[in-house]
């Protein structure tokens, strides 16, 4: 999920058996399954509606960076297929070879052979996305430039900030998108009290940890896209449901979400940025 330039502890974490259980569909938990069919689905389809007219009908090309075990991309392909939108190709990348292998198995298990042929998963780091993809796909940079309609990253962009490589990642996203293409980023909200370590820090029960210090603000998530000339369509806080929540907690929080949004939206769990590449690309 995160960058290969992060400390060795993260490489160990995201190449472990526990990572496979956490980031694949059968064992990931009820919360993420609920979100993929509700909160996340809603923002995905809203972002896709911002594509140039006729794009969905002519065949979408999708890319998810930091895709983990692939469950998000696989589910999105299924949703689009059921909704009548054609998917020409879907590509997932992650720095963890273990999770990339798991994603390939997941696609074979959950998708028909015809749909599975349209998916591919590759080992690639967020901050060197284009060059790693070129290497993995045995292709040329020119073939990837301006080739994707929709690029998304879920709970992964903060690791680029941690490595101070967020501009490199955003620049590669810009290059990969077609003019008018859309990027969507969902990640942890630094203002949320419900992240355990962050809560302990705010209550002065422990000193700030490296993870506390590395969760960007909404403005910081947005900044690299603004700097590179994207049109920022949405940048906001949303979602009160943890990925790991059980069924009961999930439905309680879902029912409370309208009230929580009304009184404390900035404290919700996720930051959302939706940015579109201009039809006429600015100088960068």
Give each language-model segment a name.
Residues 152:
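A conserved beta-strand element that flanks and buttresses the S-adenosyl-L-methionine
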Residues 167-179:
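A short glycine-rich, Lys/Arg-flanked "PGG" loop and its adjoining helix->strand segment in the class I
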Residues 234-284:
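A C-terminal cap/extension of S-adenosyl-L-methionine-dependent methyltransferases
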Residues 71-132:
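Class I SAM-dependent methyltransferase SAM/SAH-binding core
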Residues 204-219:
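Acceptor-substrate binding/catalytic loop of class I
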Residues 1-56, 75, 184-205:
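Conserved class I S-adenosyl-L-methionine
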Residues 66-70:
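Class I SAM-dependent methyltransferase "Motif I" SAM/SAH-binding loop
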């Amino acid at each position: 999920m995160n960058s290969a330039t992060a400390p060795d502890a993260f490489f160990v974490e995201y190449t472990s058996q526990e990572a496979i259980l956490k980031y694949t569909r059968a064992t990931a938990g009820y919360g993420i399954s609920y979100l993929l069919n509700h909160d996340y689905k809603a923002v995905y389809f809203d972002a896709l509606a911002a594509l140039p007219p006729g794009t969905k009908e002519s065949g979408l090309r999708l890319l998810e960076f930091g895709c983990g075990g692939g469950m998000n991309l696989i589910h999105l392909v299924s949703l689009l297929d059921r909704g009548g939108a054609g998917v020409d190709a879907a590509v997932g990348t992650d720095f963890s070879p273990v999770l990339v292998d798991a994603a390939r198995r997941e696609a074979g298990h959950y998708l028909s052979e015809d749909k599975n042929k349209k998916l591919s998963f590759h080992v690639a780091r967020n901050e060197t996305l284009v060059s790693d993809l070129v290497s993995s796909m045995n292709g040329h940079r020119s073939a990837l430039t301006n080739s994707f309609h929709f690029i998304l990253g879920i709970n992964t962009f903060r690791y680029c900030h941690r490595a101070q490589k967020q501009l490199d990642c955003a620049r590669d996203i810009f290059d990969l998108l077609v003019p008018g293409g859309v990027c969507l980023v969902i990640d942890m909200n630094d203002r949320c009290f419900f992240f355990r370590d962050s809560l302990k820090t705010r209550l002065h029960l422990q000193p700030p940890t490296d993870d506390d210090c590395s969760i960007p603000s909404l403005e910081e998530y947005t900044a690299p896209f603004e700097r590179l000339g994207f049109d920022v369509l949405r940048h906001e806080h949303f979602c009160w449901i943890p990925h790991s929540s059980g069924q009961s907690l999930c439905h309680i929080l879902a029912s409370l979400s309208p009230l929580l949004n009304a009184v404390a939206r900035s404290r919700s769990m996720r930051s959302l940025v939706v940015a579109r590449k201009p039809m006429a690309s600015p100088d960068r």
